[in-house]
Curated annotation (Swiss-Prot):
Residues annotated as transmembrane: 16-36, 347-367, 369-389, 396-416, 440-460, 472-492, 537-557, 863-883, 888-908, 911-931, 968-988, 998-1018
Localization per Swiss-Prot or TrEMBL: Cell inner membrane
Gene: mdtB
InterPro entries referenced in this protein's UniProt entry, alphabetically: AcrB_DN_DC_subdom, Acrflvin-R, Multidrug-R_MdtB
Assembly behavior: Part of a tripartite efflux system composed of MdtA, MdtB and MdtC. MdtB forms a heteromultimer with MdtC.
Alphabetical keyword list: Cell inner membrane, Cell membrane, Membrane, Transmembrane, Transmembrane helix, Transport
Organism: Shigella sonnei (strain Ss046)
Membrane topology: Multi-pass membrane protein
Protein name as it appears in the record: Multidrug resistance protein MdtB
Length: 1040
């Protein structure tokens, strides 16, 4: 078992020690490159880890959910299902709208996915209804991703139809053109149109039908090519008054003649300028508004996108009338910037604390300046590499640099402490620097590569979690590598020029007092260590008990996925009885808005009622609650949510579901709560049987809260049961019946008005204000084969039935999603386990499959790979240490320190009430790399003492422990203080940073206390084992 012999001539550091100018200029180059890189790096909340996601929306006004599913969604799904690289396809078919969300594999470029989607839509065109008003429209956006910015446009003098027209033509188009913007949606549904409201009684009295009116309007308003005349000397383009532009022109349209007298449209209908869809509405606070939600493209830089929007807004608002007001209600980048600023402050605090601890130990200003230069240089230099790797300044990379503060200073401390020891013995500074740097060079290399080895498994983590922590791991590894370079170049060079016997011996009262304190501590440690070495088996039992305890703690600690962040925005869903109308829902929404706006933490509120790409039915409403900045409110988001739900519970007939927006969005659909669980079947009937049973059981579990389902099968349906024989005798087809119903109740888009700026629709419907409710069906008239008018009631009966309000698919099969939250006193792991146990008690049939979705599915995947991740880190470190030490045994001695770190981290998390989530797990993996440093420093010097001074293993390890006690304590405290700002974090995004700090501080404290005693004992035990093994082999050889 040999190690590389330390060099007494400076080793790789010699060149840099002897050439101070070249070394200084090299470090200046690293510093300048880092500063330039820092200024060039984009800022974001988290690394870009979005799945390539595309949303396809098809609108078919008046179509029932069943028609939308069979006629629109299913043909599209069949084509989309043939695309390569598709990870998941979900769809939602509701009244008049089909929304299909396509999530592709992480490795597939978004542009490639877009091409495949466009080709699939083209292939499905001939399979879609011929009267579809518009073809399917796709957007490169994840509908579950909260908007980066929400704007409200209001006016005190103009109707909402004119406001929306201006917003759509002047504002939304310009914002959509900004790089990084994926989709601009206008909520409020006030797009201008000419609405024709037929008077059913008047039509019937004149012997007309709605189909007669529709045919007359479509024939009177056309916009087609007419040709041109090409004469001998000039060409003339043909044009005609074939377009009608205003409601007044339509009002004067002659639709028929009776007894020679014209019947104009205005005689049988109310014709007016109105909204294209009267069942849509949006509000900003209490004022009706057009709400613009701006969503980014997956992978786009959120900060630069938001900045571009804000820069454009003044120019856009200048083009609007003075009565129109544009208000930015929410901007996610505000909290992102605040979170990044807080993390940067914690990084500076970590640097300051580390420098302070260095001075406390070295008690010398020149000796403190040296690592004080090395630390920021290593961190700043990392920014240059981050630019080339297309990284960003985000919470995770800044957390990596904050943690790196404690790591990178270790190398400089070890070098300085070793060089100082020789200077204090009387060596000249230059000779001491050469000797000390050469002696410690191998230790620095061992520390560096064994620590980087721990990070290697993070690079191979799969799926979105792996992508998420790749930037973290690489950033930390780069900082550690640069630190090693600085410690072997700049640090010994500065020691040779700045340290001297006089400077090291110069002491003040503080220096003398601290020196005595450290001497007493080392003496006490020496006495304790001697006792421990005399009772090795007792110490070994303590080490083994920490291993057992760490396993037990791992089993019983609450487990989660990702910390719930307070980003100042709450997404809400308001649910009313399934038969609620738009008018009823809008009234309930305003009642809820009044209650929410009274909360002192709420700054603004936007709400939306109606069916569109995100809202599936008329009995639900979407809300976005924007909270005041964190420093202006007393409570964090979870307490605000609990308070709002309690207040809204007093509003009768509604259920409110709230969840805070998160920087990490894995879901592909807008959910009522944070977590989802799906049931998938081959038929809707199977879901209708088992969903209520499972819901009943889940709602009784204390580990779950806000349990709800998107299964809504009690929507009222007026089923028109046509007597086909009677209809056939009269020459009336089912197409005639459908057309008559569609004309009356479908807000049918029957014609288009073309202008230079935009296109507007003509909407046909019955005036239900004259004959409201189901009685309106009695006014429907059909034309028989002999030209007579036949009441619908003579050939059909109307039955009231129940049907789903929306039909959801997952990978082309019917699915229902059960949403839930987790109460504060339980963890996501508890909830997942209870759901799986409950599912087993139901004995679901084989044709029903269940699966967690979104972040819950990612949690299961991360939890399943965590143990293997830790094993991989340990194995990687063993291999590196084995290669460096040319030994199978010494790496085991070093790795024996790891259980103590796990025990400390898990205990700290449990005491602090934190879950074991992916952030905390990363902390534990980092601890694996930190705590083994103690053992490396002990074993390196013990092996050198055995080899060079001929000491016995016991004397060698005892001396090594006392000799390296101060640098071990110093490096551990430096790492601990580097993590301390994260643990004590209270600002924006603190929820994300705190678990990492808690785990590392707890692990470092426990491991520091235990490994100082267990490592030398285990070293001696393995040394004895090695001698026994050698003697056995020698005996066998002699016998042979």
């Amino acid at each position: 078992m040999q190690v590389l012999p330390p060099s007494s001539t400076g080793g790789p550091s010699r060149l840099f020690i002897m050439r101070p100018v070249a070394t200084t200029l090299l470090m200046v180059a690293i510093l300048l490159a880092g500063i330039i890189g820092y200024r060039a790096l984009p800022v974001s909340a988290l690394p870009e880890v979005d799945y390539p996601t595309i949303q396809v929306v098809t609108l078919y006004p008046g179509a029932s959910p069943d028609v939308m599913t069979s006629a629109v969604t299913a043909p599209l799904e069949r084509q989309f299902g043939q695309m390569s690289g598709l990870k998941q396809m979900s769809s939602q078919s509701s009244g008049g709208a089909s929304v299909i969300t396509l999530q592709f594999q992480l490795t597939l470029p978004l542009d490639v996915a877009e091409q495949e989607v466009q080709a699939a839509i083209n292939a499905a065109t001939n399979l879609l209804p011929s009267d579809l008003p518009n073809p399917p429209v796709y957007s490169k956006v994840n509908p579950a991703d909260p908007p980066i910015m929400t704007l409200a446009v209001t006016s005190t003098a103009m109707p909402m139809t004119q406001v929306e027209d201006m917003v759509e033509t002047r504002v939304a188009q310009k914002i959509s053109q900004i790089s990084g913007v994926g989709l601009v949606t206008l909520s409020g549904g006030q797009r201008p149109a000419v609405r024709v409201k037929l008077n059913a009684q008047a039509i019937a009295a004149l012997g007309l039908t709605s189909e007669t009116v529709r045919t007359a309007i479509t024939g009177a308003n056309v916009n087609s090519a007419k040709g041109s005349l090409d004469g001998p000397s000039r060409a003339v383009t043909l044009s005609a008054n074939d377009q009608m532009q205003s409601a007044e022109e339509y009002r004067q349209l002659i639709i028929a003649y009776q007894n020679g007298a014209p019947i104009r449209l205005g005689d049988v209908a109310t014709v007016e300028q109105g909204a294209e869809n009267s069942w849509l509405g949006a509000w900003a606070n209490k004022e009706q508004a057009i709400v613009m939600n701006v969503q980014r493209q997956p992978g786009a830089n959120i900060i630069s996108t938001a900045d571009s929007i804000r820069q454009m807004l003044p120019q856009l608002t200048e083009s609007l009338p003075k009565s129109v007001k544009v208000t930015v209600l929410s901007d996610r980048t505000t909290n992102i910037r605040a979170s990044v600023d807080d993390t940067q402050f914690e990084l500076m605090m970590a640097i300051a604390l580390v420098v302070m601890i260095i001075y406390l130990f070295l008690r010398n200003i020149p000796a403190t300046i040296i690592p004080g230069v090395a630390v920021p240089l290593s961190l700043i230099g990392t920014f240059a590499v981050m630019v080339f790797l297309d990284f960003s300044i985000n919470n995770l990379t800044l957390m990596a640099l904050t943690i790196a503060t404690g790591f990178v200073v270790d190398d400089a401390i070890v070098v300085i402490e070793n060089i100082s020891r020789y200077i204090e013995k009387g060596e000249k500074p230059l000779a001491a620097a050469l000797k000390g740097a050469g002696e410690i060079g191998f230790t620095i290399i061992s520390l560096t590569f064994s620590l980087i080895a721990v990070l290697i498994p993070l690079l191979f983590m799969g799926d979105i979690v792996g992508r998420l922590f790749r930037e973290f791991a690489i950033t930390l590894a780069v900082a550690i590598l640069i630190s090693a370079v600085v410690s072997l170049t700049l640090t010994p060079m500065m020691c040779a020029r700045m340290l001297s016997q006089e400077s090291l011996r110069k002491q003040n009262r503080f220096s003398r007092a601290s020196e005595k304190m450290f001497d007493r501590i080392i003496a006490a440690y020496g006495r304790g260590l001697a006792k421990v070495l005399n009772h090795p088996w007792l110490t070994l039992s303590v080490a083994l008990s920490t291993l057992l305890l760490s396993v037990l703690l791992w089993v019983f600690i609450p487990k989660g996925f990702f910390p719930v962040q307070d980003n100042g925005i709450i997404q809400g869903t308001l649910q009313a009885p399934q038969s609620s109308s738009f008018t009823n829902m809008a009234q309930r929404q305003r009642q809820v808005a009044d209650v929410i706006l009274q909360d002192p933490a709420v700054q603004s509120l936007t709400s939306f009622v109606g069916v569109d790409g995100t809202n599936p039915s008329l009995n639900s409403a979407r809300l976005q609650i924007n909270l005041k900045p964190l420093d202006e409110r007393d409570d964090r988001v979870q307490k605000v949510i609990a308070r709002l739900q309690t207040a809204v519970d007093k509003v009768p007939g509604v259920d409110l579901f709230l969840q805070p927006t998160q920087d990490l969005t894995i879901d592909t659909q807008v959910s009522r709560t944070q977590y989802q669980f799906t049931l998938q079947a081959t038929s809707l009937d199977a879901l209708s049987t088992w969903v209520p049973q499972l819901m009943e059981k889940l709602q009784q579990l204390p580990q779950l809260s806000d349990v709800s389902s998107d299964w809504q099968d009690q929507g009222l349906v007026a089923y028109v049961n046509v007597d086909r024989d009677s209809a056939s005798r009269l020459g009336i087809s089912m197409a005639d019946v459908d057309n008559a119903l569609y004309n009356a109740f479908g807000q049918r888009l029957i014609s288009t008005i073309y202008t230079q700026a935009n296109q507007y629709r003509v909407v046909l419907e019955h005036n239900t204000e004259i004959t409201p409710g189901l009685a309106a069906l009695d006014t429907i008239r059909l034309t028989s084969s002999d030209g007579g008018v036949v009441p619908l009631s003579s050939i059909a009966k109307v039955e009231q039935r129940f049907a789903p309000l929306s039909i959801n698919h997952l990978d082309q099969f019917p699915v229902t999603t059960i949403s839930f939250n987790v109460p504060d006193n339980y963890s996501l792991g508890d909830a997942v386990q209870e759901i799986m146990d409950t599912e087993k008690t139901l004995n679901l049939p084989v044709d029903i499959t269940t699966q967690f979705q979104g972040s819950t599915l990612a949690f299961q995947s991360a939890l399943g790979s965590t143990v293997w991740l830790i094993v991989a880190a340990v194995v990687a470190m063993y291999i590196v240490l084995g290669i460096l030490y040319e030994s199978f045994i010494h790496p085991i001695t070093i790795l024996s320190t790891l259980p103590t770190a796990g025990v400390g981290a898990l205990l700290a998390l449990m005491i602090a009430g934190s879950e074991l989530d992916v952030i905390a797990i990363i902390g534990i993996i980092l601890l694996i790399g930190i705590v083994k440093k103690n053992a490396i420093m002990m074993i390196d010097f013990a092996l050198a003492a055995e080899r060079e001074q001929g000491m016995s293993p016991r004397d060698a390890i005892y001396q090594a422990c006392l000799l390296r006690f101060r640098p071990i304590l110093m490096t551990t405290l430096a790492a601990l203080l580097g993590a301390l700002p994260l643990m004590l974090s209270t600002g924006v995004g603190a929820e994300l940073r705190r678990p990492l700090g808690i785990g590392m501080v707890g692990g470092l404290i426990v491991s520091q206390v235990l490994t100082l005693f267990t490592t030398p004992v285990i070293y001696l035990l393995f040394d004895r084992l090695a001698l026994w093994t050698k003697s056995r082999f020698a005996r066998h050889e002699e016998e042979a």
